[in-house]
Design a protein with these regions (language model features):
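Beta-propeller folds
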Residues: 1-176
Length: 176
């Protein structure tokens, strides 16, 4: 997934050449400064490989993307895991099936995502409790939180949901 600057630091992260780690580097020296994720050094769930990651805004966790399946040009479904760096704990984001378009809350304590055209919310501070936000999603009729094919293609975006600045509200587009 290339070079990803780490917010509020002079560091960046990148997936290792062997695809087993997320490595932190210094922009100034280009040298490795830390291993942020190692597929062979986790507690809890075990995975054999991963396709990408999304760092939380507070830099304490990341979403690890596995089993990626393309939908359109930019969008995909995948099985995501929550990785907590301090404890090295790896746990599924959801047990309900592949997810699309996950987004972190600004404080890194919640993750919203789309599954089957509906939006779900996972609260990390409440034992990763999952709640369904929308219930009207219907294939080829109602789409919540992700763009339809035309909007993804013409406007080059694959996410249509976000949190407000303090993370207390979720905003999304609904297509019907």
């Amino acid at each position: 997934t290339g070079i990803n600057p780490l917010e509020g630091t002079d560091q960046y992260a990148s997936i290792s050449q062997n695809g087993k780690q997320v490595i932190q580097y210094s922009f100034k020296t280009g040298k490795q400064t830390a291993v942020l994720f190692d597929i062979d050094d986790t507690q809890g769930a075990k995975i054999d490989n991963f396709d990408g990651y999304i760092m939380s805004p507070d830099g304490k966790r990341m979403l690890i993307r596995t089993k990626t399946q393309p939908v359109y040009r930019r969008s995909y479904k995948a099985v995501f895991y929550i990785y907590t760096m301090a404890s090295r704990k790896l746990e599924p984001l959801s047990d309900g099936g592949p997810q699309q378009a996950p987004v972190w809350s600004p404080d890194g304590t919640k993750v919203a995502f789309v599954r089957d055209n509906n939006i779900f919310l996972v609260k990390l501070l409440y034992n990763n409790s999952e709640s369904q936000v929308t219930k009207d999603g219907l294939f080829n009729h109602v789409i919540n939180g992700i763009p339809d094919w035309v909007n993804e293609e013409e406007f080059a975006f694959s996410h249509a949901l976000t949190f407000n600045a303090d993370g207390t509200m979720l905003c999304w587009l609904r297509y019907d």
